[in-house]
């Protein structure tokens, strides 16, 4: 096969095919005695004549992919009459041993090397700063190298600028493998060249800090993270004691896992392909589950939390993004329009039935407020928020406290009525007022998911029957609202806030009887009876800050004007379709 190519007519070519140095050029055109078939100076280990013969006999070596060395390597010189494509039109023979090229090639006014073999950094390494596991950047430059015969192709010392290993390797060694991917504990390496022998995954040693293309990664050994991270840029299990070559298989252990520091819960990955250990750090408070919140709240006393916060706010590291401010009547529940019959007239229902259901629910609301929530004592001392008077609470145990004999009702019904702010004066009286609001808070948190247990068996059945009749009359209005409320409540970065014109105690009774306690913690309920909704919005902004997005959902003019003043988006609810559209927008995460 070689003889067929070498005997093709070339008027300026002389020499035999058995010449180790390849075909010789006519001396009338060039003084050089020989040149390599591919026109390059490649220094390799000398081979014996028997190896040359066996290599030449291998038919699979007749082709060498042109993509092996990139698009610009071994490009023909357009002005040179002895370019390799004219000598060998279709094939090149890298297995034929070259001889040192003549130094008189410079007489033709061209450099001795082609563009791909220049010492310039035309093919510099491509740094990839986004690679976290130390994959060498020069690996991508060798991705296109491919041979069909498994022939090893070593790199010449004169080719350091082409596909170089970067600044860490000053002089590439002959016979060194072109690349080695270090990928989580295993390296796809070759023994002496590209795809020579059996290609397999070998456990080669990782690069140390002096062999990396990236000389320094930021270390996390300072400050409060010292217990989680090593002080050195590379963890100990990434480093080896010996300064080995990137492709030299290591006989000693490569994976040296360090012991985690005391007090840090860590779990090492048992997969042999993993070189790092996963440290399970505690989650942030905003991401904790409901069970974790309950467990954290149960041991609150043991952590010495004595002072009460009148206006609770989210923790500093909270990632709260959106606050949904809801109106209650005619937005979440249908109550006032039942009493007036306007809902029945609008939707074609029976007005007397509607009014009857409204009156029954109103009676149940005030009965619950008077019996269990001290509404008779607190009606004239209404508060905007449940914690507004908590600063007057001395933390006394109320398990054996008798609210009926402490003298508070007599003082409340005296001529000196409560002021507009709900504060009358007197340390003793204010403490008793704070006791009642604290007891209301305890009852709400205890029975918000079990209102039937608070009502008793007889009233529980009447309450469930009334709820079912109202839902049937209102075409499941409350169910549609609860779907949107529950979706918001399930998000860790969103919160539901209730602002109602009803007094605080009756509003709490409404929330409990309509089954809304699960989506409205008592700290998120505000009464706008005394100060108006716009002032409530200002308190909410002061509580959560101005970095979050506020969305107001209601049906009235007052909440719409308050939202407009504070540049808050307003979602009007006037029908079932508005609630369904709201839930759809929440599902698509538009809100």
UniProtKB/Swiss-Prot annotation:
Active site: 327 (nucleophile), 329 (proton donor)
InterPro entries per record: EYA, EYA_dom, EYA_dom_metazoan, EYA_dom_sf
Source species of the chain: Mus musculus
Gene name of the record: Eya1
Protein name, entry field: Protein phosphatase EYA1
Biased composition regions of type Pro residues, renumbered to the chain: 78-87
Binding-site residues for Mg(2+), renumbered to this chain: 327, 329, 555
Superkingdom, natural source: Eukaryota
Modification after translation (UniProt): Sumoylated with SUMO1.
